[in-house]
Amino acid sequence: GRPVIVSDPVPPQSVIDHATEIGADLWLFGRDFNFTGDKQQWGWAGRGRRYSGLAYPALRGANQLVNASGVLAALEALRSEMPVTAQAIRNGLAMVELPGRFQIVPGQPALVFDVAHNAHAVAALTENLDAMGFYPTTHVVFGAMADKDVAPMLARVAPLVDRWYFCDLPTERAAKATQLQAVWQAGNARKDVQASTHANPQAALDAAVAAADPTDRIVVFGSFFTVG
């Protein structure tokens, strides 16, 4: 009977089946809670409670309302044991921080960190990058685990990338930079894009910084190890 919150709009059926099997109190996005919003504010509705006129979360990214909706569902599910006031929720949305999730470091060139490490997260990252506006050149530092299906990840963001810096990561579970570059080369159709390999994320980032102009953009993603 313990609550399980699923904010994925299209959750795996196995998750739903397992929650049902163990008798969990399953909260599904779109069934038990949802949100609406415009450019100025948003609202949330759960099983027995509603919030209106909420400010957008302080985090950047197109998927933040989905994430925030899941948090509000968790608070609603636990309200009898851990009551939280509406004002506390409003304050939390305004002050929330999550390093490494579409984290933009101001400066020249612009620097973006994102721990996106699957196709769904990279799709959100790509949408967010596209919304940032024009940059003459986008440099990408990329490292990933060996068990990840990196081909669709690279293909999704590739139209925005002008220079790749593939890197090894400090764990045996990681794919080698040369392996990542080979996957990229197999799917690359743009002859104007350059790529290089590096021994670690810092070396790759140093190379990107050295090559970038002040008006360019550098993006670091693929793993917590890459961003960390």
Q: Model-found features: residue ranges?
A:
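Acidic, Mg2+-coordinating active-site environments of NTP-dependent enzymes
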Residues: 1-51, 68, 72-90
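General secondary-structure propensity
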Residues: 2-6, 52-55, 61, 192-196
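Proline-centered loop/turn at the N-terminus of a beta-strand
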Residues: 3, 25, 137-139, 217
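Structural beta-sheet core signal
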Residues: 6, 140-142, 166, 220
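C-terminal helical cap/extension that packs against the catalytic core
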Residues: 9-23, 27, 36-41, 110-112, ...
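Nucleotide phosphate-binding/pyrophosphate-handling subdomain across enzymes
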Residues: 45-163
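Active-site-proximal loop/hinge segments that shape catalytic or ion-binding/gating pockets
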Residues: 223
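Short, basic/aromatic-enriched C-terminal tail that caps enzymatic domains
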Residues: 227-228
